[in-house]
């Protein structure tokens, strides 16, 4: 691919129509849309170059092929202590996560920030659940009188949901539910025998007010040009050589490169956006080369900030001037505030009797989804907003006998047979935006490159605590209603970041006095700067947000291209 390695001495050689900061899900979409509209674009990625297929070095390995059989060493944990708190500490993907000793952050309150600094970002590692938001979500703040109103509604984003779904490839079922709009889907994956049975029982016992459906996933169930359908390996996080799921590498990057309009520059830490006081617009960005520590400047007519919710805020805050001492976009006092996430680490599981003669095909890279029902259609709780569940049913394997005191041939024969059916569902719930949930620049602490780090100060509050109690209670009740036995519940607590859906910090709004971005994702303080990743979110809904990032980005990029053509920016 075209890589930019210019010296930085010649301005003409460093001038483009558009700059995209970041190469993850939203950055990839920005590059695809901008280059598709004919704009010469440079994508700046702070991490290493990472090529599709070639760099998926563990994707073809079996567990026994790894030195530590999939586990990680204490030395590896020291390098990545935050990742080691959760499931991300796995030998096949440890190198995909950021070196936290080189790029630390400060926790005023416990905060789990999962970062992947490489071309493609976390698009290689994401869970691929892809759900549209509805007007229940876009209108929630206004109806509840909480925070500020979204400046858009579902109708504004619906055609862009269509646009990104058709390109990305989303498998799913048509359900006709107003709180979870249907989309442009590939054929759905199949629910297994137990999932279908449990879903039918829940639907019947709750009078058709609760719906367990197959997940809507960015995994192909039919091949499309340049990509093969999902192989049901369920090892997506190692990278898919088949292009079976959507990522920057498999999808948006090849499309952008095919236009001939994209240049990619890895190892490029954008330290600040260059603001022109006379035009009141950005004129480019300053870049620190992560390998050489040399500084360069790149210039463009439009800048898209897609570094992920927290890093995008870092770039804006670090772009302070005498006009904007709090950073570019700070005029409202909301930059860095209103951090959100999703509830995680809670739910219920149990055993399903029967179905001993049933099994399932392969390792489906998807699960089931229980659609939101709380605080909708006359249902009223003692908290605001709602939640959904994700989970799956499966049969236990040989590991069920690890703690048993058995030996001999009979024992060996027993563990070759599938065990009992089990089903589990975990809650994903909405967190409200709070001004006091914030990040700030800590200039007393520096990273490997001498740059100020982020300080995290965010916690869940009373509304979230009430919701967590209800999530667990309803999970147990639904499984009981479906005849599930030996039900166990869990709530392991929640630190912001656990859901890996960090949002907020540069929210959209209708008024520049209370928001950072307008209805087109333009920074109020510099109309040629756009932010379209998680930073832009005004509320968090309970659905996975990545599909909405894609739609917002495609919408904003095409708006930017139109405005450039008109000479408005």
Briefly describe each language-model feature range.
Residues 2-141, 146, 151, 155, ...:
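N-terminal glycine-rich phosphate/pyrophosphate-binding loop and immediately adjacent elements
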Residues 28, 243, 248, 364, ...:
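Aromatic-residue-lined binding/catalytic grooves and analogous aromatic/hydrophobic interfacial grooves
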Residues 36, 40-67, 259, 268, ...:
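Glycine-rich loop(s) and the adjacent beta-strand/alpha-helix scaffold that form part
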Residues 52-55, 171-183, 485-494, 566-569:
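Short, glycine/acidic-rich hinge or "gate" loops at secondary-structure transitions
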Residues 67-112, 117-118, 127-132, 137, ...:
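Conserved redox-cofactor binding core of oxidoreductases
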Residues 94-122, 126, 132, 150-154, ...:
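FAD cofactor-binding and catalytic pocket of flavoenzymes
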Residues 213-220, 228-236, 271-274, 278, ...:
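A glycine-rich dinucleotide-binding beta-alpha-beta segment and adjacent secondary-structure elements
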Residues 539-557:
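A conserved FAD-binding loop/helix module that cradles the flavin
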């Amino acid at each position: 691919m075209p890589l930019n390695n210019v010296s930085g001495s010649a301005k003409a050689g460093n001038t483009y129509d558009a700059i995209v900061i970041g190469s993850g899900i939203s950055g990839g979409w920005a590059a695809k849309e901008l280059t598709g509209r004919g704009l010469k674009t440079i994508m700046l990625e702070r991490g290493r170059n990472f090529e599709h297929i070639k760099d998926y070095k563990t994707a073809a390995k079996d567990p026994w092929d790894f030195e530590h059989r999939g586990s990680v060493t204490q030395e590896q944990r020291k390098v990545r202590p935050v990742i080691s708190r959760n499931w991300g500490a796995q030998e096949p993907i440890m190198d995909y996560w950021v070196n936290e000793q080189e790029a630390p952050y400060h926790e005023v309150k416990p905060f789990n920030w999962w970062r992947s600094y490489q071309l493609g970002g976390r698009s290689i590692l994401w869970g691929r659940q892809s759900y549209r938001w509805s007007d229940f979500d876009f209108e929630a703040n206004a109806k509840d009188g909480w925070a500020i109103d979204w400046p858009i509604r579902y109708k504004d984003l619906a055609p862009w949901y269509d646009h990104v779904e058709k390109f990305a490839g989303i498998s799913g079922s048509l359900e006709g539910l107003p709180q979870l709009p249907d989309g442009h889907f590939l054929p759905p994956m199949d629910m297994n025998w137990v999932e279908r049975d449990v879903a039918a029982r829940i639907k019947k016992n709750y009078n058709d007010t609760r719906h367990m459906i197959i997940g809507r996933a960015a995994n192909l169930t039919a091949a499309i040009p340049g990509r093969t359908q999902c192989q049901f390996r369920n090892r997506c996080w190692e990278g898919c050589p088949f292009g079976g799921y959507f990522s920057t590498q498999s999808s948006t990057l090849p499309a952008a490169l095919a236009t001939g309009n994209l240049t990619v520059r890895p190892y490029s830490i954008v330290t600040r956006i260059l603001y022109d006081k006379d035009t009141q617009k950005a004129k480019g960005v300053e870049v620190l080369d992560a390998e050489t520590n040399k500084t360069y400047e790149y210039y463009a007519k439009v800048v898209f900030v897609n570094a992920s919710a927290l890093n995008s805020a870092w770039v804006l805050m670090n772009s302070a001037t005498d006009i904007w001492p709090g950073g570019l976009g700070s005029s409202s006092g909301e930059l860095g505030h209103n951090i959100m996430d999703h509830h995680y680490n809670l739910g219920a599981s149990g055993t399903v009797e029967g179905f001993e003669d049933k099994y399932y095909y392969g390792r489906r890279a998807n699960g089931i989804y229980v659609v939101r029902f709380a605080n909708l259609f006359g249902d009223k709780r003692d908290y605001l907003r709602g939640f959904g569940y994700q989970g799956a049913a499966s049969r236990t394997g040989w590991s069920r006998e690890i703690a048993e005191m058995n030996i001999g041939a009979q024992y060996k024969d027993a563990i070759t047979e599938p065990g009992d059916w089990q089903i589990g569902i975990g809650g994903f719930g909405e967190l409200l935006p709070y001004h006091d949930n914030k990040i700030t620049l800590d200039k007393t602490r520096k990273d490997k490159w001498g740059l100020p780090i982020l300080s995290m100060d965010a916690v869940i509050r009373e509304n979230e605590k009430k919701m967590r109690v209800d999530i667990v209670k309803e999970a147990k009740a639904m499984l009981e209603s479906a005849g599930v036995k030996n039900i166990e519940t869990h709530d392991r607590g929640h630190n912001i970041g656990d859901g890996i859906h960090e949002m907020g910090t540069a929210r959209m709004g209708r008024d520049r006095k209370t928001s950072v971005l307008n209805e087109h994702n333009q920074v109020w303080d510099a109309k040629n700067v756009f932010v379209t990743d998680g930073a832009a979110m005004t509320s968090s809904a309970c659905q996975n947000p990545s599909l909405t990032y894609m739609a917002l980005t495609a919408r904003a990029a095409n708006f930017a291209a139109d405005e450039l053509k008109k000479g408005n920016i």
